Amino acid sequence: MKKLIAILAAGILALPAAVSAEDSSKPIVIPTHNWSSQVVMAYVIGGIFESMGNNVEYVPADSQAVYEAIRSGDVTISHEVWQSSFGKSFYNAMAKGGVIDAGTHAAMTLEEMGVPTWVIEKDLCPGLPNWEALKNCKDVFATADSGGKGRWLEGPQSWHGDLMPVRVDALGLGDDYVVKFAGGADALWADLAAAKKEGRGTIIFNWSPNFTDAEGFTFIEFPEYTDGCRKADGGDGSCGSPKGWLKKAANYKFPKTHPAAYT
């Protein structure tokens, strides 16, 4: 988490030392979502704004619907727009007007299914990280609630919809694997910790940059992403995730109502 926070903090809206007299007294509304690093950064950013003399409010928000909330002015900014998960919602809101691209962080991102690296080091599923190794490893990843199949633990369904269930079927793994959805990032990290303690294999959704970069995590290598490969875009959905950008979004009025905070 420290790595991600450092990257995001370095790329946050460039802030001058003191609040401008032009900055509105209207609160800057910052959303909080269902993954811990986003919540931590929301309060870090809010603290910076408050130190400049700005008023700040925090509101829980759905990670897809937040861009409509920004467009309508109910939310002011979003500091973590991950391309693979939220790019479409972000651009759809921009196309309607009211949302602006407030810049791109330097880090490239990847959002994908993977395994803790020790699963590979212990050779629990020979052939990983190549996805085809999964054909012979369902028992390694079976859990009490997976009905004898191997389990993929996805993030909340609001993040990607049916992207992973479609991929499992498209790869011909549907008879051997089932996708379960976690309630939030904390549930993913809890499963990761439990798997390590129990010495069992686990396939979970993860992203980079993240604190697990240092802990040791390996993304599974699925068929390469190409334009149009996902089912929603006319493909069969078997492809993996693309490397992508990490952006910031803001209400179109923000540069005018809070020029010092935005500059």
Indicate residue ranges for each PLM-predicted region.
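A conserved helix-loop-strand patch within extracytoplasmic ligand-binding domains
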Residues: 98-153
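Short, well-ordered beta-strand elements
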Residues: 23-37, 54-59, 149-153
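Short, polar/charged alpha-helical segment
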Residues: 36-55, 166-169
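C-terminal lobe and pocket-closing loops
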Residues: 213-263
